[in-house]
Amino acid sequence: MSEQESRDNAAVDAVRQKYGFGFSWLVLMIALPPLVYYLWICVTYYQGELVFTSDAAAWRRFWSHVAPPTWHAAGLYAAWFLGQAALQVWAPGPTVQGMKLPDGSRLDYRMNGIFSFLFTLAVVFGLVTMGWLDATVLYDQLGPLLTVVNIFTFVFAGFLYFWGLNGKQWERPTGRPFYDYFMGTALNPRIGSLDLKLFCEARPGMIFWLLMNLSMAAKQYELHGTVTVPMLLVVGFQSFYLIDYFIHEEAVLTTWDIKHEKFGWMLCWGDLVWLPFTYTLQAQYLVHHTHDLPVWGIIAIVALNLAGYAIFRGANIQKHHFRRDPNRIVWGKPAKYIKTKQGSLLLTSGWWGIARHMNYFGDLMIALSWCLPAAFGSPIPYFHIVYFTILLLHREKRDDAMCLAKYGEDWLQYRKKVPWRIVPKIY
């Protein structure tokens, strides 16, 4: 390992200590599963109203809606998870190398997400068309599925914990069993060529998210004889986002989660439970709320989504092209940048000269456009934008600390050159 790589790894460790979870990991592991149930129950049984009461009997009635697991739901999810794993391993797609690991090695990854995504949609469409699968099954089984997937992730995280106990030197657990269960004990656990972390990061959670949305739309049609414009907007926006994700799937290999986080309960539960069951809250709400939107409102929401996407994808593409060719023209002019003592180049042109994370700003615009079609009858469809804002604010601070530890004075110079963090002129 080079001296520079050693410094980079030390910077990662320092940032992880400062921006990790401290003792809050236990609170998260205890509180988050009930929170997802709470949101689902409020949407499904209380018309989207947030339920707060001091009456013990009312709380018992509320929590009595928690659905027990069923063999139907368990069978559905087992078939789903194993089927997606098979596609990850055997579906056609290019093989690329990941980022350097702490020991200097690189792993191979098969990037076949877009094939798996489209193949899955084709199979599900065929099964529904032939009458072998009910289009509303995921909505009808949503409660039991939530319980099944929760149970599965807790068990799976236990498997991952024991899997990594004999890992490489730089993967050693902390010696605190419950914390290691939460954070993980292995960086890249694999079964043969199946990289469990990369697989769970996208396939069983993100594609499931889309199928759940489609099931919500089918349920709305079954109940009301129509699929409303708000439902079409939500499903359309999120489908486009997922297609874009899988087209650019290789970019996930450069993310913090893949490069630095071990694979434990936190990522496992977040990928398999949090993502599909909370990112579908807008569609869940719209199943029983069939309001219309004015034409100007539809135009404004579509414009917000497209503008957010243009900023999000445009910023990411600019940085990707700059890394490949620093002499590339950005917005009609030669790229401007700061060269660090380590030799890295910090782009200060284009979107990256407006704010340090304009891609986050675009992502937040997209997230808000997913919520607005639900109108303002309930705060629950807006849970996503609140959570996502908190997430990106934390991530920006973590990234800033990481770059300061890595680049020192050069990063301070970059801060002066580009003072705004996410939102130009505001933050």
Curated annotation (Swiss-Prot):
GO terms for molecular function: Delta14-sterol reductase activity; NADP binding. It catalyses: 4,4-dimethyl-5alpha-cholesta-8,24-dien-3beta-ol + NADP(+) = 4,4-dimethyl-5alpha-cholesta-8,14,24-trien-3beta-ol + NADPH + H(+). InterPro entries: ERG24_DHCR-like, Sterol_reductase_CS. Residues 47-70, 132-141, 219-226, 284-291, 378 are periplasmic. GO terms for biological process: ergosterol biosynthetic process; sterol biosynthetic process. Changing residue 363 to A: Loss of catalytic activity. The keyword Transport does not apply. Pfam families: ERG4_ERG24. It is found in: Cell inner membrane. It is a multi-pass membrane protein. The chain crosses the membrane at residues 26-46, 71-91, 111-131, 142-162, 198-218, 227-247, 263-283, 292-312, 357-377, 379-399. Its EC number is 1.3.1.70. The keyword Cell membrane applies. Reduces the C14=C15 double bond of 4,4-dimethyl-cholesta-8,14,24-trienol to produce 4,4-dimethyl-cholesta-8,24-dienol. Complements the deletion of the Delta(14)-sterol reductase gene ERG24 in yeast. This is Delta(14)-sterol reductase. The gene is erg.
